[in-house]
Amino acid sequence: MSYQRQSGKFPGWDGTPLFYQCWLADDPARGRNLIIHHGIGEHSGRYQPVVDTFSGEQVNIFALDARGHGRSPGKRGDSRALADFVPDLECFFEFLKSEFQVRQPVLLGHSMGGIVAIGFTLRFSNQWHLRSLVTSGAGLRPSLDFTQKIKATVGRLLRPLAPSLTVPIGLPLTLLSHDKQVIQSYDKDPLNHGMVSLQMGVGLMDAGEDLIRQADRVKIPVLVMHGEEDQIASMTGSIDFHEACSSPEKELRLYPGLFHEIFNETPAERQRVLADLHRWVLAHLPEVAPRETAATGASTVDAT
């Protein structure tokens, strides 16, 4: 079974038209729902391996491009961190509920998206009846070398004066994955960027430790995934977050030898990671609705 891919725009918290795309099952009204938030500098189109994993499973998949990323407007890499991203994600949920009748989804966040997904879960998990939270390579605690620590210190000092000033993130692309084709594709993709503003960078770093401190408030099922050789986001952040979560159902999956983008690692390793994701997500989504009781078809937004 192949997905029906659609795309369009939805209004962010301040009315900014943000890009989204979705992959709908053959009978969307009966499908279960997975929502994805990408990481810093990238976009929703880089999650095709995840999409392919659920082909034939009656799972609708929805992903947005955060402001300042991908096909969404805004200065590249500039936002007020969670102060923008979490309200935007809530607007996305509202849009999906209205336009696609999305109910009881699983929320997946990678890297920066992991921070956003955790922040959203702490505020809205009950309101939106989240079935589960999944994080991969969550950027709760960045792995900073000496030069990056200096940049972070200077950025914190300058943020009040020039919050939207953007600087290069400065991370080697070779730290994303062991798969050379993934690195080449990332480098050639015009929708990716390597910039971050002072307010966004410092805001995300501050948010990470704060979310770990609040992790005991996470009550829903949680799957925490992280590559043990991740040199972009330290796995200690994911370990501490998982340990602090008070959810009665939580799982920590650490992958020896894997870099930051565990869904984009070499084919053999990628399949192992995706199999774990597939197992968890299907176990925590509702049962497929019987065909005779399914809701009427959802309205959609054409690509723009």
Predicted features and spans:
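Catalytic active-site module of serine/aspartate enzymes centered on a nucleophile-bearing elbow/loop
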Residues: 251-304
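Catalytic nucleophile-loop/oxyanion-hole region of alpha/beta-hydrolase
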Residues: 41-44, 70-104, 272-273
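Short beta-strand/loop motif that positions the catalytic acidic residue
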Residues: 218, 224-226, 230
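Conserved alpha/beta-hydrolase
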Residues: 51-75
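Short alpha-helix in the alpha/beta-hydrolase fold that links the catalytic acid
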Residues: 220, 234-243
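N-terminal cap/lid segment of alpha/beta-hydrolase-fold proteins
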Residues: 1-26
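Alpha/beta-hydrolase-fold enzymes
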Residues: 112-197
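Active-site glycine-rich loops that stabilize anionic/oxyanionic intermediates
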Residues: 38-42, 228
